[in-house]
Amino acid sequence: AENTISNTFNFQIVTYIDLRQNNSIESIITNIINIISNDNNEARDFAVLASSTKLLRNIDILYRQRTNEQTEITFISNETLERLKQIHQVTDEKAANWKFNRDFEALERTRKQLFTTDKRCLKISTIQSFKGWESPSVIVILENDIVLHNTTFRPMSPQTIYTAITRARENMYIINIGNDTYHNFFY
């Protein structure tokens, strides 16, 4: 279900998309691609923001596969993560060691430092890492708080939502993939 919500931030477009019943990664990507193509802007004018790097990694790789376009990310890519796991022989059965963690953190830090909004491609970032940046159009993905509680990431606090919303200069799109807390607020 798609809904245009009241606009107190003076955005040109504010759209809420409820994917709580169909929150597959394919459905999320299809909606992101449709938003970009229907907006008459280019992918470079968009940033996709969420709380979880795991979700964003999946969005990044599938978006690149479906569109054959590059992305600019604030975290290491799925491919880099898999290579790092191979180098350190990390598997589902064999946990990460301190060398893996050291290299992972160094690569993540470098990605954040190299991130820029000047590149001519879609930007994908955690909400926290996008603080201080802006984009003409922002797509915020509201994740399920229960899923987030089982990770190292904080649930979507009102401050986090505010930070995400205020990153957009012109257009705001919200894709809810399971967050009941904010559904009534945005719908």
Which residues does each PLM region occupy?
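Core RecA-like ATPase module of SF1/SF2 helicases and allied nucleic-acid translocases
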Residues: S37-Y187
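Inter-lobe coupling/hinge region of RecA-like P-loop helicase motors
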Residues: A1-T30, D39-L49, L122
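Well-ordered, non-membrane alpha-helical segments in soluble/globular domains
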Residues: I25-I33, P155-Q159
